[in-house]
Amino acid sequence: MRLPLPVSRVTQNGRPGYRWGESGTFYGYTPGNEASRARAEARATRQGQAARAAGYEEPTFTPPASVAAAARRGLALREAQPPSNKAGTAVGIARARDLANRRPLSVDTLRRMASYFARHEVDKEGEGWGIDSKGYQAWLLWGGDPGRAWVNRQLSNL
């Protein structure tokens, strides 16, 4: 599946700039200088367009069945809860749908998932962790333990 190569605003060594996709060149600009910012964005955009024209595609990763199953369990568990106990942000629910449907994910999405798992690993040690807890529901929405293991494995191979 071909995913778009977006131009995004990034920071490198404390300097603002633009980059397309995950592997594009960093084009820095001078803060407060609109002309410099516009040039950097235009250069990154042109590089992305040239890469697309040459047939370049960013790598994608299809979630395995175990991750899809965990996300489906999370969605089902969330649906079975009363409104006051439904977990998951809009982003978490969207991620669960992508995982459950085994949609290809970008490297950037894998990194966001790894960040989620790193931040929320401690939730598992909290009181009340279990099938009815919001933390458990949210963990499953992001793919659960199989998701964490898969994401870490994919990122370590890059």
Describe the predicted segments one by one.
Residues 1-158:
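Arg/Lys-rich, low-complexity, intrinsically disordered basic segments
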